[in-house]
Amino acid sequence: MDPYKHRPTSGANSAYWTTNSGAPVWNNNNALTVGHRGPILLEDYHLIEKLAQFDRERIPERVVHARGASAKGFFEVTHDVSQLTCADFLRAPGVQTPVIVRFSTVVHERGSPETLRDPRGFAVKFYTREGNFDLVGNNMPVFFIRDGMKFPDMVHAFKPSPKTNMQENWRVVDFFSHHPESLHMFTFLFDDVGIPLNYRHMDGFGVNTYTLISRDGKAHLVKFHWKPTCGVKCLLDDEAVTVGGTCHTHATKDLTDSIAAGNYPEWKLFIQTIDADHEDRFDFDPLDVTKTWPEDIIPLQPVGRMVLNKNIDNFFAENEQLAFCPAVTVPGIHYSDDKLLQTRIFSYADTQRHRLGPNYLMLPVNAPKCAHHNNHHDGLMNFIHRDEEVNYFPSRFDPTRHAEKYPMPPRVLSGCREKCIIDKENNFKQAGERYRSFDPARQDRFLQRWVDALTDARVTHEIQSIWVSYWSQCDASLGQKLASRLKIKPNM
């Protein structure tokens, strides 16, 4: 089905003004009044319609990733990975698939500067022959928490105070003082990469662990990585202040202007894979979203390239109404038991139904470009005309049948019902290794950002001591330096 077939007629194809229902408007400058100075009449339908439409132009803002920019292009397979997955769009080198990508900041509101220290969203929608595939990630390979139960609390801590409507450091460091698994993510957020130069010069990661399934049903755990061909570049704190003060939409402008000039952004896609039968061979849990997979023992494998060569035509239609969900996969790519991914599978689609309505997948930007059919009918803002009589399954009057079964390896699950943490937490090792990989100047900038966060007037001595203890367990010298700057005695 062509997702654009039932798109409402554009308002730009009439030579004169009309109402939404098509009636001609002979005066779009003045309201209907009694005489020159009399009251406005309620019967001025065009005025009422115009104001009512204006009053409803805005839809609910995304609870996270509100500020964003989109672009369109294609993904091309460059290396054969057919032995790992039966996904049709990865079937052979040379295969191209249309994509739309949305880059975003995470915590801050829709009109916020793009120079604030914040993770960046990196979401890709592939329009494949077997349906859409949404790879919904960030520019950092790990996350703050490993269990989605804490996601609402985490966002609340980052968001402005419900009392003052201001972002306050004491709220952030207080919340995460209870979650040492966040340390690895903070070695990215408080590092120089915490403020990318723009969207073209940043990495992308699927973050969560997915599963690739081959034609013979073999499963491999997989991590996805996007690497920009123009390299990774960042803004230091003082540079961000200058750039943000000059243009608070600098990253959107850079992306739009680059594509318009023919300087198309490009990323290479790599994967890391682990045999699903070998996931217990490491000192970390491969399903733990707070951990990276060491590239020296699990090397990157090239897959393809993505080129963005077309700007969007309408910001509202192709950015604000663009909707992603990690549950949207294709045969050959499946979920894992990653606890954060499991909660995202529900939450993303749920928030889109809240923002856009139950039929958000009918919107042209979200609809698949392949043929599709089901009995999901009606509902708010259902604008696709359907004339079939049979809206149930099965039926002898409707030849539609089940699709061919695609490979899905059987699994035997056993265990007690319980709420618990994972066995291999190992919260400090990778955070310490990353800190030690910084050069001395970069280490000092990282340290100073923590000093700034922990010297907020509301941060207590207890909270400071906890963070000194955490960073000491990552790296003894880092803990000592932080304690010295804070003028407190280290616990270790």
From Swiss-Prot:
Organs and tissues of expression: In whole endosperms (aleurones plus starchy endosperm), in isolated aleurones and in developing seeds.
Cofactor: heme
PROSITE patterns attached to this UniProt entry: CATALASE_1, CATALASE_2, CATALASE_3
Cited Gene3D superfamilies: Catalase core domain (2.40.180.10)
Chief location: other
Top-level taxon of origin: Eukaryota
GO MF annotations in UniProt: catalase activity; heme binding; metal ion binding
Subcellular location, record wording: Peroxisome; Glyoxysome
EC number: 1.11.1.6
Matches recorded under SUPFAM superfamilies: Heme-dependent catalase-like
Root EC class: oxidoreductase
Matches recorded under InterPro entries: Catalase, Catalase_AS, Catalase_clade1/3, Catalase_core, Catalase_haem_BS, Catalase_immune_responsive, Catalase_sf
Residue numbers binding heme: Y348
Catalyzed reaction equations: 2 H2O2 = O2 + 2 H2O
GO BP term, example: hydrogen peroxide catabolic process
Keywords: Glyoxysome, Heme, Hydrogen peroxide, Iron, Metal-binding, Oxidoreductase, Peroxidase, Peroxisome
Pfam families in the record: Catalase, Catalase-rel
A GO cellular component annotation in the UniProt record: plasma membrane
Enzyme active site: H65, N138
Family: Belongs to the catalase family.
Subunit structure: Homotetramer.
Described purpose of this protein according to its UniProt entry: Occurs in almost all aerobically respiring organisms and serves to protect cells from the toxic effects of hydrogen peroxide.
Name the UniProt record assigns to this protein: Catalase isozyme 1
Source species: Hordeum vulgare
